[in-house]
Amino acid sequence: MKQVINCLKENNPLINKKLKEVSVDEGLKIAEELFRILNERKDGIGLAANQVGIDASVAVVNVREPIILINPKIIKQWEPVPYFEGCLSFKGKSVQTQRYSNIIIKTEQEEAEWYFSGAPNPSDGKGSWEKQEQSKHDQELRLLEAICVQHEIDHLNGITISDRQMLTTIVNTEKFGRNEIVMITNGEETKELKYKKAKPLID
């Protein structure tokens, strides 16, 4: 019976590998197994095939509802947002990454593109969404869902949260407010600074 491989304690040769694409039928079978593992653990909201030793571009997410990702690709992403993430493959480790509050993806099993948004007021005509008032809790869940989808798609491309932490050195700097906390990487040292203090270091 397959289980999540803890990369802090044992080697997982697939964790940094771009996974092979699979058919929809094979992907659905793998997704069923991933949901079983996720439901048994009860401490995660998403899981990718390589986290349990399967070389297949398949992942599942379960935040607001179960989502299956077979050979997914991010078509568009916008509105960067800093976020602290953990990972079942690196249990107990948490890093700040930069994700996007809005993404559009395409999967193998769906003809239409999927739009995920954690933004309070989605706008600018990208994708489609329901125009209704959202509670703060619902906004938080939608953002978490969008970030989890990005996290799992990263896994399918051999990218982990450790890789994303190193990339959080200010991208699209005009999106950050003066007092927003960002992460600066200088050689091997990574530290948090307010954007107004970090900006001179990256200009």
Predicted stretch roles:
Residues M1-I181, T185-E192, K196-I202:
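Positively charged
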